[in-house]
């Protein structure tokens, strides 16, 4: 006969409570397993499962050794100040100024930085002061809308193409007509003067791209391939390449001398309205009426990126002459981008019109011309609009003909040339009498900047 061991009432209560918890209690009432038991199981599994990979391969071991050696060579920042002596055994620092330039006893050390620092929106870069622009000269002679302009590299003359199917050469200093070139059978939409050759390139709505020899004033080459009107062209600054774009929705890259079509840059679903070539990178930038900007790798002839931030058709592009940036314009919107990847930088807000043309000079002045005759001048760095004026249609023209069709700065950046719908060419210059006191910058930082 078994003898039941005697238990005290307290022990019986603990045993009963333990049994009840094991049977009916939730997981958080269960007895915690011993840590030693878990470590034994982990060590056993490590030994049985990872025995064959305990040693790293020689190549990986050498790579990790090099990384460890590089980390050990980095200078370590000691917790003490450099001026403390070797006999200082106490843990307290004797430095008067903490690392970071703040005094050790300064008030508010434990305050969050958000209460001390200003928001980034209120620390915007102030715009640079620019002199306002005023009308200098009005040049008449064309019988149609002036749709294209190009300045000669030596800054002695400029060319204009218009709806009267002619190209006219003007003296930049006096505005006198020097020459008229005929050959197109429709509106001349694009002009470019080669900086290395005595060539003038033109394109028009007659599907033609022509190369003019300025020594004989005759056409020496035709570039055939476009299926519809050619609206824009650009020369690569370093290579003998010509890029054209038009209503057929493609941009074509031509060898200037052999007239061969090197690439057909297809991808746009609308008219290619403007083309720019990037000097520091073999890249072509195209803007289209399908509201996209495409960045093309000129070597491969393929798309590098598509910028879809605009909501309406893009009619003009402008690359900065010295910086690695460019701008694009659509109806009521101008955006600035970074090359070569097309990272968005900022908006130029305020020009509510159909923007036909953009131009930028080396002094960081951006000009935008609208279909309704509105003109805006911007600071390229900050996007601040420092001047707005409206052009005036010439006597005998309709009010609806007060539109800016094309624009360009001369080689010095001190003269702005605009081609307008009233069949005139206007030359603008900066006001020599203006000072920061007479025309102050009325700028205030914006708290909420529109991202895209």
From Swiss-Prot:
Top-level taxon of origin: Eukaryota
UniProt biased composition (Low complexity): 61-70
GO cellular component assignments: catalytic step 2 spliceosome; cytoplasm; Prp19 complex
UniProt keyword Cytoplasm present: yes
Biased composition (Polar residues): 114-125
CDD domains: WD40
InterPro entries (alphabetical): G-protein_beta_WD-40_rep, Prp46/PLRG1-like, WD40/YVTN_repeat-like_dom_sf, WD40_repeat_CS, WD40_repeat_dom_sf, WD40_rpt
Keyword terms: Cytoplasm, mRNA processing, mRNA splicing, Nucleus, Repeat, Spliceosome, WD repeat
Gene Ontology annotations of biological process type: mRNA splicing, via spliceosome
Coiled coil regions in record: none
KW Nucleus (keyword) present: yes
Subcellular location: Cytoplasm; Nucleus
Primary location group: cytoplasm
Annotated region (Disordered), positions in chain: 61-129, 432-452
Assigned protein family: Belongs to the WD repeat PRL1/PRL2 family.
Self-association and partners: Associated with the spliceosome.
Protein name per its UniProtKB record: Pre-mRNA-splicing factor prp46
Organism lineage string: Eukaryota, Fungi, Dikarya, Ascomycota, Pezizomycotina
Protein's gene: prp46
């Amino acid at each position: 006969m078994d003898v039941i061991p005697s238990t005290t009432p307290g022990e019986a209560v603990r045993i009963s409570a333990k049994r009840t918890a094991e049977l009916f209690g939730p997981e958080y009432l269960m007895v915690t397993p011993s840590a030693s038991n878990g470590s034994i199981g982990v060590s056993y599994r490590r030994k049985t499962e990872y025995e064959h990979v305990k040693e790293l391969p020689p190549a990986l071991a050498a790579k990790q050794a090099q990384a460890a050696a590089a980390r050990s060579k980095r200078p370590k920042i000691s917790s003490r100040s450099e001026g403390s002596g070797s006999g200082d055994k106490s843990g307290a620092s004797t430095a008067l100024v903490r690392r970071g330039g703040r005094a050790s006893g300064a008030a508010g050390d434990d305050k969050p930085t958000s209460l001390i620092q200003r928001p980034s929106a209120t620390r915007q870069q102030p715009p640079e002061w620019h002199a306002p622009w005023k009308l200098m000269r009005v040049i008449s002679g064309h019988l149609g809308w002036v749709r294209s302009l190009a300045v000669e590299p030596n800054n002695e003359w400029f060319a204009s193409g218009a709806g009267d199917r002619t190209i006219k050469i003007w003296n930049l200093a006096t505005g006198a007509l020097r020459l008229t070139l005929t050959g197109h059978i429709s509106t001349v939409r694009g002009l470019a003067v080669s900086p290395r050759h005595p060539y003038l390139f033109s394109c028009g709505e007659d599907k033609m791209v022509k190369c003019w020899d300025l020594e004989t004033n005759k056409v020496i080459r035709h570039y055939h391939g476009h299926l519809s009107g050619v609206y824009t062209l650009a020369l690569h600054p370093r290579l003998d390449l010509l890029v054209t774009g038009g209503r057929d929705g493609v941009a074509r890259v031509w060898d200037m001398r052999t007239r061969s079509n090197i690439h057909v840059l297809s991808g746009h679903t609308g008219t290619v309205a403007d083309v720019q070539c990037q000097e520091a990178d073999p890249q072509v930038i195209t803007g289209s009426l399908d509201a996209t900007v495409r960045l093309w790798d000129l070597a491969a002839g393929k798309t590098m990126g598509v910028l879809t931030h605009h909501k309406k058709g893009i009619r003009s592009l402008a690359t900065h002459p010295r910086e690695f940036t460019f701008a694009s314009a659509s109806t009521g919107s101008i955006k600035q981008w970074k090359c070569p990847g097309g990272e968005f930088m900022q908006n130029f807000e305020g020009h509510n019109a159909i923007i036909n043309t953009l131009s930028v000079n080396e002094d960081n002045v951006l000009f935008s011309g609208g279909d309704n005759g509105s003109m805006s001048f911007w600071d390229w760095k900050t996007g601040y609009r420092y001047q707005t004026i409206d052009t005036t249609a010439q006597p005998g023209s309709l009010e609806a003909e007060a539109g800016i069709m094309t624009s360009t700065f001369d080689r010095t950046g001190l003269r702005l040339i605009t081609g307008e719908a009233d069949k005139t060419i206007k030359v603008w210059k900066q006001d020599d009498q203006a000072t920061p006191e007479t025309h102050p910058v009325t700028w205030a930082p914006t708290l909420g900047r529109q991202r895209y």
